Every structure is written in C-alpha cells, then in structure tokens.
From Swiss-Prot:
Annotated source species: Anthropoides virgo
Binding locations of heme b b566: H98, H197
Molecular function terms, GO-annotated: metal ion binding; ubiquinol-cytochrome-c reductase activity
Membrane topology per record: Multi-pass membrane protein
Cellular localisation: Mitochondrion inner membrane
PROSITE patterns hit by this protein: CYTB_CTER (PS51003), CYTB_NTER (PS51002)
Pfam families: Cytochrom_B_C, Cytochrome_B
Note: Heme 1 (or BL or b562) is low-potential and absorbs at about 562 nm, and heme 2 (or BH or b566) is high-potential and absorbs at about 566 nm.
Protein name (record): Cytochrome b
Chain positions recorded as heme b b562 binding sites: H84, H183
GO CC annotations, alphabetized: mitochondrial inner membrane; respiratory chain complex III
C-alpha cells in the first residue's frame, strides 16, 4: 500500500500535524477561536498592506497625496485602505479577547507560549503605532511627536535617544522613511513570532475551559475545529466588511483629515481607540518618567501573570471570587479607554488615576490574594 503523502511528505507532514491530525480537547469553546482569527487578521493586513505599499510614497511632501491618490485613482484603492485601517481595529479586538481568555482560563501557565504571546502583543502595538504615522495627517504627525518624545524621559541618554529615533531635531522626512521601513518589516517579524508561539503551544497542547488534563478525550482538529474556525472567519469578516464599506471612518480621528502641519498643534492629541487604556495610564501620573514607566508596566505586567497564580485550580470556571475580580478588571479597562478619549480636566483626571491604581492593584495584589483565599475555602 502506498504511503499517505499527507503523513510522509516532509512539508505536508508539518501541516498535517498542525492543522489536520492535531489532537484537540473536545470541550474547547468559542473563546479558543481567537487564535485562528488573529491569523486571518495578520494575513488580511499583510495582503492589503502590500497592495497599499505599492502605491505609497514615503516622503513628507508626497505621503498624504499618495494616500489620497490610492483612494481616488487606484482600482478599489479606497476599499483596500479601509480594510487595512479597520483591520487593525479588528486585530486588536481579537488580541485583547485572546489575552482575556488566557487570563480567565489560566492559559498563562504555559509560560513559553504566554511569553511569546506578550512579545507578539508588543510587536503588534509597535507596528500599529508606526503605521498610524504613514498617512501624514495632523494626528499622525503630532501623535508621532508626542509618543517618540516619551523616550526623552529616559535619564541621561533620553534626548539623544529621541533625536536618534527622529533622525534629526524633529519629526520629519527621515522619521517617516524609517517608520515606513519598520511598518513593512514588523508584520513579517510577527509572522515568525507566530510560528514560535504555535510551536510552543503544540508542545503542550491546548488548554480547555475546565483546566484539567484532557489527553483521554481529544478529537482531530479537522473537520471539527477547522469548520468551527471557518464559521469564526465568516463572523469576523462580515462586520469588518460592513465597517469598511458603510462607516470606514467611524473609529478614526477627524483630526487626521488635514495634512500634517508642524506649525499648528491640534486642540487635543489622542491615539487610536486600542491604545487609549495605556494612554490614560500614562496621563494619570503627573511626572513624565513616572508616566512612561506606568505605560510600559501596563503591558509588561502580563509577563508576571504566571508568577502571580496562587490558586490550586487553573481556570476561573469554578472560582466565583476570581471571576468577580476578572470582570471588574474588564470594566476598569473600559473605563480607562473612555477616560483616555476625554480632555485632561476634572473629573476625568481623578477617574483616570483611580482606574489606573485599580488596574495595577487587581493584577498585582488582589488576584494572588483571592487565589490563596479560595485555596483556604476549599479546605473547609
């Protein structure tokens, strides 16, 4: 009998072991769909990004016009641009839900998979930031100025660091050129990191909603979860297309419609919605260095999740106290996102400071204490 090519061919064998014959826990819920949705987001962003890059000119005098030209004169250029801009929003929606799932179900106990995931998040944030600068609108220019300026808070080498990043004494042509280079390069880095992320995941196998070893009850990935993933793709691509076709500027900032003008400061400077929670944490501390450290800590704190797990149970499925904390944290992040979009005045300042304090308190103090308390309660 001839050998099955799918199982014997060196390349097809890898695909088979990752996507077809992969043993998967039978009880994973729709929360496990977001990994594959992130894969689709990445593929969509790279495809639309390549098509946009073909018509883009990384020069301060031409960047804005080249984007306008793409939207007006290139076949379906408007659609490609709208899909790319709104695809970024969907990318972040999926990654935040994916991280939330990981925190709720204790997936962070697969330390290597979790750590590569956090590195992926940081890379994605960097990619989105440099990408936002490329259309060279007002908010692109001033956003780049404000955020790169944060590096000047680094003691001793800060100012040198900023000028090195800018390629001059202000955000100008060299900055735009290098940001375009980075925006082109980073998605391919994300692809590489994704493969590492999956390699680590397939070493241990997927977690499941009960958080128990499921080796005795696994089913092949195909056709069960491949079909479930395709349903997920359709359910995500439908709202993405709806947003891109009917309301493409809903999530954008109207301040980015005028071309960049270094002589006119916009009335407010704020990032895209997916960075607002971190921006609110940055603004809540009146000291520049303190704000930058809090901003960095707001994301880097995820690296500590495995160390702060004190419960004997892996998931929060049967831990009502931890569940209450988790949903409080979720509400807290939504409050931070809202505060980040508001002007720096009373009462938003104090709300932002309280929400920032709550964010760190829940993650660093209350989660471990609650885990230990629930262990005690199990003994009674």
């Amino acid at each position: 009998m001839a050998p099955n090519l799918r199982k014997s061919h060196p390349l097809l064998k890898m695909v088979n072991n990752s996507l077809i014959d992969l043993p998967t826990p039978s009880n994973i819920s729709a929360w496990w769909n977001f990994g594959s949705l992130l894969g689709i987001c990445l593929a969509t962003q790279i495809l639309t990004g390549l098509l946009l890059a073909a018509h883009y000119t990384a020069d301060t005098t031409l960047a804005f016009s080249s984007v306008a030209h793409t939207c007006r004169n290139v076949q379906h250029g408007w659609l490609i641009r709208n899909l790319h801009a709104n695809g970024a929003s969907f990318f972040f929606i999926c990654i935040y839900l994916h991280i939330g799932r990981g925190l709720y179900y204790g997936s962070y106990l697969y330390k290597e998979t979790w750590n590569t995931g956090v590195i992926l998040l940081l890379t994605l944030m960097a990619t989105a930031f440099v990408g936002y600068v490329l259309p060279w609108g007002q908010m692109s220019f001033w956003g780049a100025t404000v955020i790169t300026n944060l590096f000047s808070a680094v003691p001793y080498i800060g100012q040198t660091l900023v000028e090195w990043a800018w390629g001059g004494f202000s955000v100008d042509n060299p900055t735009l050129t290098r940001f375009f280079t980075l925006h082109f390069l980073l998605p391919f880095m994300i692809m590489g990191l994704t493969l590492i992320h999956l390699t680590f995941l397939h070493e241990s196998g997927s977690n499941n909603p009960l958080g128990i070893v499921s080796n005795c009850d696994k089913i092949p990935f195909h056709p069960y979860f491949s079909l479930k993933d395709i349903l997920g793709f359709m359910l995500m691509l439908l709202p993405l297309m709806t947003l891109a076709l009917f309301s493409p500027n809903l999530l954008g900032d109207p301040e980015n419609f005028p071309p960049a003008n270094p002589l006119v400061t916009p009335p407010y400077i704020k990032p895209e919605w997916y960075f607002l929670f971190a921006y609110a944490i940055l603004r809540s501390i009146p000291n520049k260095l303190g704000g930058v450290l809090a901003l960095a800590a707001s994301v880097l704190i995820l690296f500590l999740a495995p160390l702060l797990h004190k419960s004997k149970q892996r998931t929060m499925t049967f831990r009502p106290l931890s569940q209450l904390l988790f949903w409080t944290l979720t509400a807290n992040l939504l409050i931070l996102t809202w505060v980040g979009s508001q002007p720096v005045e009373h009462p938003f300042m104090i709300i932002g400071q309280l929400a920032s304090l709550t964010y760190f308190t829940i993650l660093l103090v209350l989660f471990p204490i609650t885990g230990a308390l629930e262990n005690k309660m199990l003994n009674y």
